[in-house]
């Protein structure tokens, strides 16, 4: 509804709970809010005394749409949904991220494997986490191997060993692959690891102490010494950890502000043990308070499907949380589980709150420093290439294939803060002559810039091509055909002997090559962007090639027709999951014998990687 007459408009608003959307002259949603009383909340925007941020927003508001909800909880959940849908510029916006990684223990296997895992939790077994990032998973994986010596190798590697691998030599595995440990003893290792994951370190220490005493009495001193070392390592770990006093799962949210920017850090406490932390830097309008940022951040983060259903029993914030009970009830309702939120600084959480706030401040400081550094590098590119306007966004394309097979084009995007990975794109190339890099590049650029021209994304200031003047000419022709203007076209070509540092740069419309010194910061960033496009293209190409070869091999297996192939892919949810499956898991598919399962397994691993 337009607001030509605010007084009359406000009288039409309901007094119940709901959500309001503020729209500009083009009908674009620029702010979304929730309210217990819509009339009272929206009226507050028409007072004379408003802060500068709200004044700037209201100067653009042309209409306000309201949605009535049945209760307050529904209003909060709908607000989070609308923010995700419309991405309003005056809301705190949490960037999309990858799903969280786990440690996966294949407990259904005779000798369970412990491994890194990311994705939907379909495979049988135990999942521990989520961890904030891949680094935390690998750090904990190394710790578990050191303490409990569980195998990490793939099924194919495990079943084809005739002697122990290096992991056994460095005392990170007990070598069940060659029978150096029996199933019962290995199961004890697995049980100890599970207790450790669950935070029951005391129980593990009691068990290990009993085994140490028994082996010592039986004069098996080497084994007794092994248990002694395990006990020492566990006790050392206990001293390093701040234990909350409970065994539940807790997220501690720290928040910090610097020069108008706001950053968060979440400490992940699982079973009384901190398994890592992760920083977040949402887009926050200038003038946003810490309390407002916290109120908008929490629902967006915990209602995201990327959480994969992993919600802690308690959330603790380092700053007071407005509408704490409202948010607590709404999240409990929306997530269909009981959730507690604590914002008071008292035992047993006080130390965690201080640590979370410190991590948030430190991460924000580093983020701003990196942002400033990147802005300087973009400015250096503008000066070094003598470009007319400042650069805020660069796209780079590269092509990858193996003798024309499984050609893939990559597009990576860099902005003022570094790589923008959510905007990366890969293009599976088809319908061009194998090995025709020009044709592949034309197809990728056409597909990309048709969408950008139609408004699906943002046009870059600079388009960088991995190649020479020939590739640059293809890019110029595509953009001219699509009538896309305002994009500076550049290319980076390999130098003599393909040596790094000797690359040549081209700018469309200029005849001469550009050679920058090897220590030039603009040159370093151009190389970094080119290398990232190359990495992304190669990864996508290898995956496509492996998938195509496996599909081709599956078609050649006797007994695997189109229907059975479809049944296999449907059962596992895709080719990637089928490749991860063991022979035993494949044999569980209705109509697949153990002999056929082995043939399928061998086919899946013949071309893997």
Curated annotation (Swiss-Prot):
Its main location: cytoplasm. The keyword Calcium does not apply. The keyword Zinc does not apply. InterPro entries: GIY-YIG_endonuc (IPR000305), GIY-YIG_endonuc_sf (IPR035901), GIY-YIG_UvrC_Cho (IPR047296), Hlx-hairpin-Hlx_DNA-bd_motif (IPR003583), RuvA_2-like (IPR010994), UVR_dom (IPR001943), UVR_dom_sf (IPR036876), UvrABC_protein_C (IPR050066). GO terms for biological process: DNA damage response; nucleotide-excision repair; SOS response. SMART domains: GIYc (SM00465), HhH1 (SM00278). Pfam families: GIY-YIG, HHH_5, UVR, UvrC_RNaseH, UvrC_RNaseH_dom. GO terms for cellular component: cytoplasm; excinuclease repair complex. Residues 15-92 form the GIY-YIG domain. NCBIfam families: PRK00558.1-5, uvrC. HAMAP family: UvrC. The UvrABC repair system catalyzes the recognition and processing of DNA lesions. UvrC both incises the 5' and 3' sides of the lesion. The N-terminal half is responsible for the 3' incision and the C-terminal half is responsible for the 5' incision. This is UvrABC system protein C. It comes from Coxiella burnetii (strain RSA 493 / Nine Mile phase I). The gene is uvrC.
């Amino acid at each position: 509804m337009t607001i030509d007459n605010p007084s009359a408009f406000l009288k039409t608003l309901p007094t119940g709970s709901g959500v309001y959307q503020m729209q500009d002259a083009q009908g674009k949603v620029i702010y979304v809010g929730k309210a217990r009383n819509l009339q009272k909340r929206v009226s507050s925007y028409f007072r004379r005394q408003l802060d500068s941020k709200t004044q700037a927003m209201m100067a653009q508001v042309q209409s306000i749409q309201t949605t009535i909800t049945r209760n307050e909880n529904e209003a909060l959940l709908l607000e989070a949904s609308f923010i995700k849908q419309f991405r309003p510029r005056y809301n705190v916006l949490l960037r999309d991220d990858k799903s969280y990684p786990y440690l996966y223990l294949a407990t259904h296997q005779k000798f369970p494997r412990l491994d890194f895992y990311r994705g939907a939790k379909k495979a049988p077994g135990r999942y521990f986490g989520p961890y904030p990032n891949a680094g935390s998973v690998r750090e904990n994986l190394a710790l578990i191997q050191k303490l409990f010596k569980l195998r990490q190798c793939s099924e194919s590697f495990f079943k084809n060993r005739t002697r122990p691998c290096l992991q056994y030599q460095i005392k990170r595995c007990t070598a069940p692959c060659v029978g150096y440990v029996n199933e019962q003893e290995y199961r004890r290792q697995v049980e100890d690891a599970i207790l450790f994951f669950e935070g029951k370190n005391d129980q593990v220490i009691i068990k290990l102490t009993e085994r140490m005493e028994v082996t010592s009495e039986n004069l098996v001193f080497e084994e007794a010494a092994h248990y002694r070392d395990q006990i020492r390592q566990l006790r050392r770990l206990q001293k390093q950890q701040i234990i909350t006093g409970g065994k539940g799962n807790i997220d501690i949210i720290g928040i910090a502000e610097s020069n108008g920017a706001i950053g968060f850090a979440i400490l992940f406490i699982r079973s009384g043990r901190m398994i890592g932390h992760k920083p977040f830097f949402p887009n926050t309008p200038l003038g946003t308070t810490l309390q407002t940022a916290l109120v908008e951040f929490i629902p967006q983060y915990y209602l995201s499907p990327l959480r994969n259903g992993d919600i802690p029993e308690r959330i603790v914030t380092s700053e007071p949380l407005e509408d704490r009970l409202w948010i607590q009830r709404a999240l409990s309702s929306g997530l269909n589980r009981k959730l507690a939120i604590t914002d008071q600084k008292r035992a047993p959480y006080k130390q965690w709150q201080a640590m979370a706030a410190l991590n948030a401040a430190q991460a924000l400081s580093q983020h701003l420093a990196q942002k400033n550094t990147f802005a300087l590098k973009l400015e250096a590119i503008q000066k070094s290439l003598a470009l007319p306007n400042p650069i805020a966004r660069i796209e780079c394309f590269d092509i990858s294939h193996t003798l024309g097979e499984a050609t893939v084009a990559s597009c990576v995007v860099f902005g003022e803060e570094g790589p923008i990975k959510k905007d990366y794109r890969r293009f599976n190339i088809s319908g061009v002559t194998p090995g025709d890099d020009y044709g592949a590049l034309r197809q990728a650029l056409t597909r990309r810039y048709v969408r950008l021209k139609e408004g699906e994304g943002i046009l870059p200031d600079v388009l960088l091509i991995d190649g020479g003047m020939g590739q640059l000419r293809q890019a110029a022709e595509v953009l001219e055909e699509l009538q896309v203007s305002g994009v500076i076209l550049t290319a980076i070509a390999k130098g003599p002997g393909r040596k790094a540092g000797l690359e040549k740069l081209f700018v469309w419309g200029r005849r001469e090559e550009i050679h920058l010194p090897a220590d030039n910061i603009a040159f370093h960033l151009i190389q970094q962007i080119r290398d990232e496009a190359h990495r992304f293209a190669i990864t996508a190409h290898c995956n496509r090639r492996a998938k195509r070869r496996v599909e081709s091999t599956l078609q050649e297996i006797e007994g695997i027709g189109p229907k059975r192939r479809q049944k296999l892919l449907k059962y596992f949810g895709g080719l990637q999951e089928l490749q991860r499956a063991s022979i035993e898991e494949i044999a569980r598919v209705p109509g697949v014998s153990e002999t056929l399962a082995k043939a399928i397994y061998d086919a899946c691993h013949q071309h893997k990687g």
